[in-house]
Amino acid sequence: MKTIIDNFVDRVIEYGMYNEIDKIYVKNRVLALIGEEGIDRISDENDLKQIKDYLVEIALKNGKIKDLIEEKECLGAELMNFIVPLPSRLNDIFWSSYDISPQEAVEEFYKLSKDSDYIKTSAIAKNIEFRASTKYGELEITINLSKPEKDPKTIAAEKLVKATNYPKCLLCMENEGYQGRINYPARSNHRIIRLKLGDEVWGFQYSPYSYFNEHAIFLNSQHVPMAITSKTFEQLLEIVDILPGYFAGSNSDLPISGGSILSHNHYQGGKHIFPMEKAKFESEFCFKDFEDVNAGIVKWPMSVIRLQSENKNRLLDLATKILNKWREYSDLEVDIIAMTEDVPHHTVTPIARKVDGRYELDIVLRDNHTTEQYPDGVFHPHQDVQHIKKENIGLIEVMGLAILPPRLKPELEEVGKYLLGEDNAIADYHLEWADQLKEKYPRINKEEVNSVVQHEAGQVFARVLEDAGVYKNTPSGHEAFMRFVKSVGIN
């Protein structure tokens, strides 16, 4: 049996960053972080992340850190950093491995990101995930419980922290190895693979709070704002060439229709087949001068033009033509407005894939204009569905995966109690919906109530996506969609 610190040191050496001769050195470096009291505790624990948690507890007892989530996270990341190579070494390892097997290189990087606790697998496991059958196929729902909520002590401590603009944002290269602070996440164990996209240097990393398998982030090495251009399509198609089996997509570059970070140009990707990818063509056509590109409208709640070709350059040229036309296209009959004075409203959410040597590009048309009736956005979740989802509909939601707020875990449980006629604390904003469900399921029982509520939450998410779709799934909506397609030019 070994002491907990010796156990930790042995596990660190197993990862190959240090040799047997480094044992004393590593132990002393760990002691500098956690203190020297309580280190004789015997442990046969083999899980490195669990041992790390024990060492953080020792550091807390020794007064090396305060009892704040952020300080524990910072120390935890510092301890796990012992198993992660320096950025230069890791990039050498990755690209050397890539030359032999791209798939193996990616798998090794993903494994390291999990093993080092950069990807918060334990926290992610807390999420509630389910699927819901809709007329658009099965949609995926996640109630996001993974990110720790701030406690009162942390909120109080934040007020005492001086403002700083370093790192500039959560997506900057400056985060690599950053210790973290009270109001900023720990990144000591964070590493970024450098890659060239065209003439630009970009970074490839994983999301610490993944929403799907191998949830990757690709970030510009420079702190430049989101911008959907021809270069966006080019870079997304390049990513799917570099990383076999990955999709790559971008949030749009305008508020309301975009993601939460517009200040730093980035894409997302991963190894996951989203519901939208499974959706079939509703109608197919041929764009003029692009007879070699298969094209059509996808049967989906949002407005999607899908392009398919083995020729990447042809796909790029057609996508650019569609984007340029959409930027200036208005159709007042269906409330589609490209510009208000000098303010642009039109952009796209693009998603690239490569399947069996064939490139596929989904172009989701977006419009962010507002009216008095819809101050949050004409093509944003409307008031009657905001009890489930009121946040922006970004890339992940567009593809059919709802990321719902933590409040919905207890709130949906209360909706279930309401349907059963039990004592409950149902939120006022769920009442109208719950009454509709009561009417729809008059004889609901305890065994089925949870699955019924989840299924119906999925139907609301489908409506959320319909609200965000610029062309509605009606005969007049389809007719209007085809007016735009014809304006681009079809045979």
UniProtKB/Swiss-Prot annotation:
InterPro entries tied to this protein: GalP_uridyl_Trfase_II, GalP_uridyl_Trfase_II_CS, GalP_Utransf_C, GalP_Utransf_N
Q: Where in the cell is it found?
A: Cytoplasm
Which GO terms of the cellular component aspect does the record hold? cytoplasm
According to the UniProt entry, the coiled-coil residues are none
What catalytic activity does the UniProt entry give for this protein?
A: alpha-D-galactose 1-phosphate + UDP-alpha-D-glucose = alpha-D-glucose 1-phosphate + UDP-alpha-D-galactose
Pathway the protein acts in: Carbohydrate metabolism; galactose metabolism
**One of the GO biological process terms:** galactose metabolic process
Q: Which UniProt keywords apply?
A: Carbohydrate metabolism, Cytoplasm, Galactose metabolism, Nucleotidyltransferase, Transferase
Q: Which family does it belong to?
A: Belongs to the galactose-1-phosphate uridylyltransferase type 2 family.
Report the protein name in the record: Galactose-1-phosphate uridylyltransferase 1
Native species: Streptococcus pneumoniae serotype 4 (strain ATCC BAA-334 / TIGR4)
